């Protein structure tokens, strides 16, 4: 499957470069397109030209690229246009070893496959406490029972209220609410001024401390915590105190937008509004794969096929912009006038 996806990606990327007839083509592009177009035309009875000039020729090349993307993704989209019929025989062209794939395309596909077969720490986009079901007001002392109490202020900040002379461990408070956290990077600080339950202003006692695995860490210093070593807090003073913990970032074994290179800009390109026709075509392809058709997913993709699909569809968007095909999609009405922000916003809603 890697070879088929790499060949499709190589052909689609090569087609981006052929729109200017005055430019000499790269030898690698000529070899790739020469073989790919011959195989495609022979199997599908199409007549794609290597140097498309007319609108019909540009349409034919874009349809070939669409066929190759769909074949690589094993997607059949059915009747979506009076001008385009998917050529199911395209997979036969991609399966042949005659079509070369370029180094970058194969590296991209192999990187995706390799990364999705294993796990590694990557930076998480959401805050560690985004899954908390309740929060509390910052700087408001609240210990209904016992001598210490911790709570969440927002998705990145937690606070610990302590009576005079109190101490305790805060591992459960600081650990993320979901996922397999590897390392958490936080800073802690005492709240200089806070309010008691009646609203009176109080000052934290001097000498409050935090230890990680028995080692004192200074307020304001970045602490790298593995979520296992004990994190203890103490208030040896004679007054109540509040300590604030701010998580700067943390890493997890969960998939992220850094799992493979350039995943974030690839998603942006996939879901960018190029035209009503492209907007509909992209939606149909993703719907057939049970992926988000209009807006990017809430969480980063977790499956190899999803990431390969994003890479191929983003490249198909580049070809669409380069070739400027003109064809109809069922149910799509061409907008009147220029595309503007209001029209695009309406398309996403």
UniProtKB/Swiss-Prot annotation:
Q: Where in the cell is it found?
A: Virion
| Superkingdom per UniProt | Viruses
GO BP annotations, alphabetical order: fusion of virus membrane with host plasma membrane
Q: Specify whether Glycoprotein is a keyword of the entry.
A: yes
Q: Where is the signal peptide?
A: none
Alphabetically sorted, this entry's keywords are: Capsid protein, Glycoprotein, Outer capsid protein, Virion
Sites carrying a glycan are 45
An annotated GO cellular component of this protein is: viral envelope
Molecular function in Gene Ontology: host cell surface receptor binding; structural molecule activity
Cysteine disulfide partners in this protein: none
Identify its protein family.
Answer: Belongs to the orbivirus VP7 family.
> What exactly does this protein do?
Major structural core protein; binds to structural protein VP3. Constitutes the surface of the AHSV core.
On assembly, the entry states: Homotrimer.
Indicate what this protein is called per its UniProt record: Core protein VP7
Organism equals: African horse sickness virus 6
Q: What is the lineage of its organism?
A: Viruses, Riboviria, Orthornavirae, Duplornaviricota, Resentoviricetes
- State which gene encodes it: Segment-7
